UniProtKB/Swiss-Prot annotation:
Family: Belongs to the WD repeat G protein beta family. Ribosomal protein RACK1 subfamily.
Species of origin: Caenorhabditis elegans
Keyword DNA repair: no
Phenotype of the disrupted gene, per the record: RNAi-mediated knockdown causes a complete loss of nlp-29 expression following fungal infection by D.coniospora and a partial reduction following physical injury.
UniProt repeat feature WD, residue ranges: 5-48, 58-99, 100-141, 143-186, 187-227, 228-268, 269-320
Alphabetized GO MF terms: protein kinase C binding; ribosome binding; translation regulator activity
SUPFAM superfamilies in the cross-refs: WD40 repeat-like
Descriptive protein name: Small ribosomal subunit protein RACK1
This protein's record includes keyword Ribosomal protein: yes
Length: 325
């Protein structure tokens, strides 16, 4: 049987703060990468299709999107690749025209840091989560259409995501109250509370077919939930704080940023198949420890994994065939 492995092929270097989120878009075999950072910017990268042999830089920032005046916590790309959406600790969201490289809308309503943002599958609706403990729904004109308060989180809302389907769409949210919540988009009412985490939840990710989601956070447990049945499926041990998660777009893999490592599980047999660690001299990062991996994104073809770290670097891994013994 052919075995696949992840191989570090290079880096993207340009941020001067932690890389808080990464988003990708591919058109005509050309991948555009966006990254948000604590340096208050969003960088747009051109990524080389051919990786260098020395594992050095494999792309360059071609544009810097500026406007936020505090850490940028999240960035996503519209499904047509024309727009980006960002959230910041400056309490606002911004919509960006990627062709022009300018912010076209500023979304003002949250009273505290915006921690997470997302586009609906049809790009017509926007959701945001904040330290003000609220979830807000917006249109693309930056009008707040609804604020979820009934049954909402009792602590910071750390992450919000739409299901990828336009049919019976839901929003999945999680927060520092240790709860993962699923909301009906049609009426903004709570559909399910997923309870099981023993610490704050940092991240949720929804599978490409919308049938399940995974959550992770302080307790180091990757929990899988059935979104259709509204039940817990199983738990995978991360053994350290989980900062980010992403399903592969075309393999039955779940990828998690766990402390300084990246763990990849094959969900078919529920086994960890890979653990990726940055090879870095400990003196090169703060507190003499390895940089933490805090953001993850796959390319749309599932061949490339982009990982953002607290040493301000994006490391780029590619799926390759493992050499047989």
């Amino acid at each position: 049987m052919v075995q696949e492995q992840m191989k570090l092929t290079g880096t993207l270097e340009g941020h001067t703060g932690w890389v808080t989120q990464i988003a990708t878009y591919t058109r005509n075999d050309k991948t555009t990468v966006l990254s948000s950072s604590r340096d208050k910017t969003i960088l747009v990268w051109d990524v080389d299709s051919v990786a260098p042999v020395d594992e050095g830089p494999i792309g360059r920032p071609v544009r810097s999107l500026t406007g936020h005046n505090h850490f940028v916590s999240d960035v996503v790309i519209s499904s047509d690749g024309q727009f980006a959406l960002s959230g910041s600790w400056d309490k606002t969201l911004r919509l960006w025209d990627l062709n022009q490289g300018v912010s076209t809308r500023q979304f003002i309503s949250h009273t505290k840091d915006v921690l997470s943002v997302a586009f609906s599958a049809d790009n017509r609706q926007i959701v945001s989560g904040s330290r003000d403990k609220s979830i807000k729904l917006w249109n693309t004109l930056a009008q707040c259409k609804y604020t979820i308060t009934d049954d909402c989180h009792t602590d910071w809302v750390s992450t919000v995501r739409f299901s990828p389907s336009n049919r019976d769409p839901v929003i999945v949210s999680a927060g520092w109250d240790k709860v993962v919540k699923v909301w009906n988009l049609g009426n903004c009412r709570l559909k399910t509370n997923h309870i099981g985490h023993t610490g704050y939840v940092n991240t949720v990710t929804v599978s490409p077919d919308g049938s399940l989601c995974a959550s992770g956070g302080k307790d180091g447990q990757a929990m899988l939930w059935d979104l259709n049945e509204g039940k817990h499926l199983y738990t995978l041990p991360g053994n350290d704080v989980i900062n980010a998660m992403s399903f592969s777009p075309n393999r039955y893999w779940l990828c998690a940023a766990v402390g300084s490592s990246i763990k990849i599980w094959d969900l078919e047999d529920k086994k960890e198949i890979e653990e990726l660690k940055p090879e870095i001299a400990s003196s090169g990062s703060s507190r003499g420890s390895s940089p933490q991996c805090i953001s993850l994104a796959w390319s749309q073809d599932g061949q490339t994994l982009f990982a953002g770290y607290t040493d301000n670097i994006i490391r780029v891994y590619q799926v390759s065939i493992r050499a047989s013994n």
